């Protein structure tokens, strides 16, 4: 893939603004969420109580063309809620595997005392869904993962489950891409956003994400399209190119540098065919090219936000893409996220 190069990072602000306008980024949260929470397009078809705080919902999702799972970590008083009772909401977006349970099994969010008075919403998504409305080779249609979140998950939470208007978001890997992209493109949606080991500038390394999709059996060209032919689509979804939309949103960015860290095992990441270019360019000692690329993209977005005067905190550390560092990084980001929820 030849067209996406480092030059994309030097595009003018005017070019970025055109891409933002083309993507509808200047619409406010109310417009993109639908007129009212009562207009939620999805339907909860099952509820399952997992423990005294954890509830799992099965959602029939027109946007996804099937069913999805959303887990809730409920706050104090939630079981006895009355109409009109509302809590601040932390949305935690799943990574590329789409597995919402990572937040309770790996990140251990249920152990955080700071979240006892917060409704934590953990939606799943399709494998390698990228929190994106897929291009689908020009046909559109399901999975429309962004639409699922904006027009189904959030309205359902606000209509039936006590979610209030004070929202923050965090995500690991592709979930971080989703949290930042949504925060940048939908004004007023989140008061703060955090991303851990995330592809936050994927147009910089398109072959990495196309190859990663193929590696897990997903047609990567169905997501954003071909980076030559659908270059504008790639730009429209890229958080870096919507950085101006984050100028007034506190952001926490964290990523490993791809070199072994204290929480990594001895084995390198499996080789992903198609990533040879980035393997060859990787620094000596890198064992996770995926995380090294995420680290580079994180630095680039952090620098861009800093140049705009945005409130951003960047943490780059030795480590790979296993997700084991998310436990620590979520706790680093939590004061910023909680400050937004208390406003």
Language model features with spans:
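N-terminal signal peptide c-region/cleavage motif recognized by signal peptidases
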Residues: 35-37
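Non-catalytic cap/lid and distal C-terminal segments of serine-dependent acyl enzymes
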Residues: 2-3, 19-28, 39-343
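N-terminal secretory signal peptides
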Residues: 1-15, 26-31
């Amino acid at each position: 893939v030849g067209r996406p190069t480092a030059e994309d990072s030097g595009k003018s602000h005017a070019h970025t603004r055109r891409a933002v306008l083309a993507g509808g980024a200047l619409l406010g949260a109310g417009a993109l969420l639908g007129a009212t929470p009562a207009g939620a397009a999805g339907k909860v078809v099952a509820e399952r109580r997992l423990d005294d705080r954890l509830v799992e919902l099965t959602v029939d999702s027109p946007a996804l063309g099937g069913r999805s799972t959303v887990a809730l970590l409920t706050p104090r008083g939630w079981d006895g809620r009355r109409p009109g009772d509302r809590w601040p909401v932390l949305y935690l977006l799943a990574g590329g595997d789409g597995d919402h349970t990572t937040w309770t099994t790996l990140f251990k969010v249920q152990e955080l005392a700071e979240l006892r008075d917060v409704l934590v919403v953990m939606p799943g998504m399709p494998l390698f869904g990228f929190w994106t409305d897929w291009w689908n080779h020009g046909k559109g249609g399901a999975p429309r993962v962004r639409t699922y979140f904006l027009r189904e998950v959030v309205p359902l939470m606000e209509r039936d489950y006590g979610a209030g208007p004070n929202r923050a978001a965090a995500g690991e890997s592709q979930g971080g891409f989703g949290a930042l992209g949504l925060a940048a493109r939908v004004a007023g949606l989140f008061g703060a956003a955090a991303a851990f080991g995330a592809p936050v500038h994927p147009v910089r390394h398109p072959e990495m994400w196309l190859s990663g999709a193929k590696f897990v059996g997903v047609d990567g060209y169905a997501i954003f399209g071909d980076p030559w032919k659908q270059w504008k689509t790639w730009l429209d979804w890229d958080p870096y190119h919507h950085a101006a939309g984050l100028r007034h949103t506190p952001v926490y960015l964290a990523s490993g540098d791809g070199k072994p860290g204290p929480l990594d095992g001895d084995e390198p990441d499996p080789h992903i065919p198609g990533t040879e270019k980035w393997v060859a360019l990787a620094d000596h000692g890198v064992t996770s090219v995926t995380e090294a690329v995420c680290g580079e993209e994180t630095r680039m977005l952090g620098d861009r936000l800093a140049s705009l005067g945005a409130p951003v905190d960047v943490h780059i550390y030795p480590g790979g893409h296993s997700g084991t560092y998310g436990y620590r990084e979520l706790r680093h980001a939590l004061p910023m996220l909680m400050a937004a929820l208390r406003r």
